[in-house]
Amino acid sequence: MTWQELLASRGIAIPQKPEDTINKRVVVNPELSQKEKTFSLNIELDEDQNTAVQLALAGKSFCLIGKAGTGKTTTEREIVKAILSRMNGRTHIFRIQGTGEKVESPAAAVVSYTRVAAGNSRNAICKDEELRNAFFHNVTTIHNLLEYAPVFFYDDEKEKESMRFIPQRNALNPLNVQTIAIEESSMVDLNLWDRLYDAMLSGTQVIFIGDINQLPPVFGPSILNYALVQLPIVELRTVYRQKFDSLVLTNAHNILEGKEVEEGPDFKIIEGGTKQHGQTVTMLQLAGSLKRWYESGEYKPDEDIILSPFNKGDLGSDSINSHVAQFLNDGDVYEVIAGIRKLYVAVGDKIMFQKQVGRIINIKHNPMYAGKIPKPHSKHLSRFGVMLEEDDLDSLEDDGLAHVEYNLEAMSKEDMEELTHQASHVVEIELETGELLALRKAGELSAQNFSLAYALTVHKAQGCEWRKVILVLHKDHSILAFNELLYTAVTRAAKQVVIVGKKFMVAKAIATRRIKGDSLKEKVEYFNANLAQSHISCV
């Protein structure tokens, strides 16, 4: 039986026009046993979920779309089981995330843009013991699947050795993977898709999983936009998560439908009075509130997250991180100089390194550093680089940084390059995966790679979930106050949402859409009109 015949037997039409790609009716064969339908005896899939599993079994590329709480993760887990049932012994050599070691595993992968999203997918999929044993290392980031690695080259323009990361998997060294499912595919930009597409063998099945209502990539459209106008679409329409007993999920759907949000114990809007203050005053008020909530147990830094539309400004995630760290951690603060950047961090700080959350476990002098001497570490040094109280200078340690001397004339050009790339300290971290890293180079501690993680931008938070989300929404954030951002922020919360901002800003965000259209059909038509002249292929 061909896949077209199989799909026809299930009542699934293969579309010719974008508006026909969305599943409208599914006919499930009543003769199929529960096990055959779901590949799991304790889960019963609905019609839309069953459609997705049958498409996966048929080897057909398609899009799996669903709003918050519609069972995408459950469906994804059953899809993986279906895919494994037809592998016929085909395998691929995967690189293990973090260690670089190689492992042979079935020739299918579930990939995400970030490590955090990949970790969440891995935890969800591998709740099933069978999948944990067979598929653990198959759930990874796109970059790791493509085996990105540093390559050194001579930059003629800069007249020096340089380094960049490039994928080791490409058209000349392709992936021997039969099926690739892309989780949170709305986050994947076209450049990264090009690299992945280049490394795929002809005929590779690709399943695009995502929520079209979330934020698109920072730069340009996502590959999901293109997939939606080229491939069959299965839209999950039944809400399961929390069964609407929480205002978090109720309001997430209210936001999508352009309705006013409801307030209650698990969804609060704190306006802070009638007057609209500037960012500086609002930040001081927020810091005071966060400290009180922390002391009362309402704010738990290990379980909760503070989100902001921006990373810069007094109410950006960088500033919020500094304020929160100031009252959370009273240990010695170190001024770490990393190129032109100065960080003020302490042992125990919650951090994010390359989009993965962890903790600082040690900070020590970097003997390779030969730059400007940083301030001595002290519990009186603030997170903004200001000494709050007079310290006994004789008691302060200088970490030996003042005593580093090098015979520069005797050093090779390579050694000089290595020397200039060093940070003032070695920052040792432990990631949530248990991976231990020692960050000593300025690039490793750059703003792109390293930050405190009490607060994040909404973009960086995609693919993650916390107990409580505290969203800061100020009038100065108006340029980014749109429906997709508010929806993305709200759906990061499992239990409670607290919006710190004026209600008119919430209303503005609900009413403003970056992606035109209320329904999936209208959004697909919008994408089709805007992408008609492109030559991006998803199959």
Segments the model singles out, each with a brief description of its role:
Residues 176-179, 203-207, 496-497:
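Loop/turn-to-beta-strand initiation segments
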Residues 107-176, 456:
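Inter-Walker segment of RecA-like/P-loop motor cores
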Residues 184-196, 215-222, 481:
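Conserved ATPase-coupling elements of RecA-like P-loop NTPase cores
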Residues 4-5, 9-33, 468-539:
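Helicase C-terminal subdomain and adjacent C-terminal extension
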Residues 173, 198-202, 491-493:
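Short, conserved loop/helix-junction motifs that constitute active-site signature segments
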Residues 183-184, 210:
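Walker B catalytic acidic pair
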Residues 353-500:
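Conserved helicase C-terminal RecA-like lobe
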Residues 26-33, 39, 50-70, 76-79, ...:
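Conserved helicase motor core of P-loop NTPases
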